[in-house]
């Protein structure tokens, strides 16, 4: 699928970002459980997730310029160090204001890692295999993210070291990033201006939104899904009488479905068309989400439902990435990845905050209403984008 000399960069970046997935997957539920143990409600959990997302928006805006100036590898190494420190210090800070600042710093550091990593991966394959190559990347990330709640369950029994352990996990991403090859600064800047085939290399942020709204809507949908499931699904399961281990296992099943089904989604997209499969995933999510309150009471079917739900939701994000690589190159691809990350941060901020308020007033099952409205918005955006030309 890739030329031999590209596999080293692909494996290096993918392995590093996958390790970061483990850190993210453990930190979000650990934060939610720690706040709940202190007697704080879901609204505080939602705002804490929103603080990280708000920091992510700032980090996203800075990513393209920082990358062009300092290089991909150097920026990613700096960000890993800051992410690790922001998690470790949660162990020693008691005030909610301190936690809010640390979560914001976490968001600032994580956003460039995903912006740069995803643009890097998306620049490697040709369009004929892009769906499968990007799916390998997202699958690797999600498989490690799946292990996050399991790590949370393990470290929750050692509360005096829990955040220390989760913070140290991020440092495991450093070797892979250090091995990836970064071109000299002059060559990199020239590459960001280069046009490949009919792809847009100079599109502005606004132009990307105009000609490819499904990229933005897909990222927003899965960002909300990701954060809401990590933060609120365990709490919903606990409300239904699940043990802590079973509640966290529900999250694991969701992301196992996400990880397992991504290559299939990529293969289908390469074979039948990226836009068609993208749209089908959105419609499928609209059908599945309203069933969640019913399925939670049916053992066996509940786990199968979560598995399929995770796979369908994950394919929306994977194919948003594929679409950005299919349409854009150079600096425009970096901006498209930045826009995905910015949208992710914005949706991760608004989604959990809104969900926290909704859950506070209407109960845990109401979280599906927030996600269903976003899924409907994605389907409409995809339909709108399919009627517009590839370039403006």
Regions found by a protein language model. Give the residues of each.
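A late C-terminal transmembrane helix in Major Facilitator Superfamily
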Residues: 333-360
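Symmetry-related core transmembrane helices of the 12-TM Major Facilitator Superfamily/SLC fold
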Residues: 162-178, 368-383
